[in-house]
Amino acid sequence: MLINDHDLNVERHGSASGPAVILLHHGLGSVASWRAQLPELLDTGFQVIVYDRWGYGRSDGRAALSMPHFSEDIADLLAILDSFEIEQTALVGHSDGGTIALLLAAAEPKRITSLVTIAAHIYLEPKMGPGIETLRGKYQHDARFRDGLRRMHGDKVDAVFYGWYDGWTQPEYVNWDIRPCLPQIECPTLVVQGAADEHATAQHAADIAQGVPAAELWMVPGVGHMVPQEAPEVFTPRLLEFLGNTIASD
């Protein structure tokens, strides 16, 4: 699909008459990141849109990511909604995708029916630095990890990884903080974070939940940053329950 002059790999599943849910992958992810959730969302009757963000997976390559403000990603997401003539949707975003979801829900509150964030970032905190550096070492020295990313991103894999790494390590972003926009979010929101998250403290998740007016916090015991992939057996049922309850009550 041609969106804002670049080609995006966009998949639309289910009936167009079903309630819309958009899945936003994490900073090194792709549509494949949601393979454990997609079938069950479809079985529940949702219309699901999942896509490789610009620069990722089977979408066009990208010279640099618009991090951490994600302005180009937000513009793409709005254009996808408009292309499918979707007036309202639920958003489910993981990590960077969760940040994008928060920013869009704050900017366009009437268009978002329900919001689920998993390990989203709303400011930079000291714990993020060591976690990012650990992943850089893993990418450089762990062939299995690198090959897994290559299967998702192909020849773009270096651009994806170092674009993400560079985006979160720019010194000019040290004071980045989106907490002031969170009160603008109007929809029911589930804030999810693994209790053993390698990139964020429990306070980070609490700050998201405290900032969004209609939010509830779920800390998942014994799970790290990759909640949908590490613990689908507990995450997916809770996701379906939350979306079903909040969209139905809209």
What residue spans do the PLM features occupy?
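Flexible "cap/lid" loop of the alpha/beta hydrolase fold
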Residues: 99-107, 112-144
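Catalytic active-site module of serine/aspartate enzymes centered on a nucleophile-bearing elbow/loop
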Residues: 216, 222-250
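Conserved alpha/beta-hydrolase "nucleophile elbow" surrounding the catalytic nucleophile
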Residues: 89, 93-95
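Active-site loop/oxyanion-hole signature of alpha/beta-hydrolase fold enzymes
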Residues: 50-89, 237
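Acidic catalytic loop of the alpha/beta-hydrolase fold
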Residues: 196-200, 225
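Active-site nucleophile elbow and catalytic-triad environment of alpha/beta-hydrolase enzymes
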Residues: 164-181
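Short beta-strand/loop motif that positions the catalytic acidic residue
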Residues: 185, 191-193
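Conserved HGGG/HGGXW glycine-rich cap/lid loop of the alpha/beta-hydrolase fold
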Residues: 11-60
